[in-house]
Amino acid sequence: MHCPFCRHPDSRVVDSRTTDDGTSIRRRRQCPDCSRRFTTVETCSLMVVKRSGVTEPFSRTKVINGVRKACQGRPVTEDALAQLGQRVEEAVRATGSAELTTHDVGLAILGPLRELDLVAYLRFASVYRAFDSLEDFEAAIAELREEQRERPAVDDEDHEDAGAERQGTDRGSGGTVEVPVPATVAD
């Protein structure tokens, strides 16, 4: 690393620390020639190849802005959007690839967005997957409904007692609830 003051071709690393968000390394350096200190920040560049073939750096802000449009009018907080942006960036960096396509980034967004808000997920998926007809929306909604049907079945198997309690309270005005018989001294 060249010294920015005297242009000496070498420098010594005095201290290294990761930044708070963990995406870069901050290094404190000292020039062996002029003894002045300076700071460098190293980040791993992550490039996104767009459909047009243009390559640009990955931007968490761009991800959040795109998802924000899908969440317009929905009860989604800015904090939740920031967390989603961080999860997406972590997911795409975890691939280990220096270049990703917009398709890869879109796939990384769909999972966390589905967990965040189903309506926003449908809005985003309709653009990302280029829905052309009502059948495309109906198929996506049917997929979400099927997933919701399967999810309580898994939860009930894991938490049978909680499911029994829920079953008794969710029946509404016409349902009956079994009351356990108290134990007697003879038991």
Curated annotation (Swiss-Prot):
Cofactor info, note text: Binds 1 zinc ion.
An MF annotation (GO) of this entry: zinc ion binding
Top-level taxonomic group: Bacteria
Domain ATP-cone: 46-136
Role: Negatively regulates transcription of bacterial ribonucleotide reductase nrd genes and operons by binding to NrdR-boxes.
This protein's UniProt keywords: ATP-binding, DNA-binding, Metal-binding, Nucleotide-binding, Repressor, Transcription, Transcription regulation, Zinc, Zinc-finger
Zinc finger (unnamed): 3-34
Pfam families (alphabetical): ATP-cone (PF03477), Zn_ribbon_NrdR (PF22811)
Entry-linked PROSITE patterns: ATP_CONE (PS51161)
Family (UniProt): Belongs to the NrdR family.
Cofactors required: Zn(2+)
Protein name, UniProt field: Transcriptional repressor NrdR
UniProt xrefs under InterPro entries: ATP-cone_dom, NrdR-like_N, RNR_NrdR-like
Region (Disordered): 146-187
GO biological process, one term: negative regulation of DNA-templated transcription
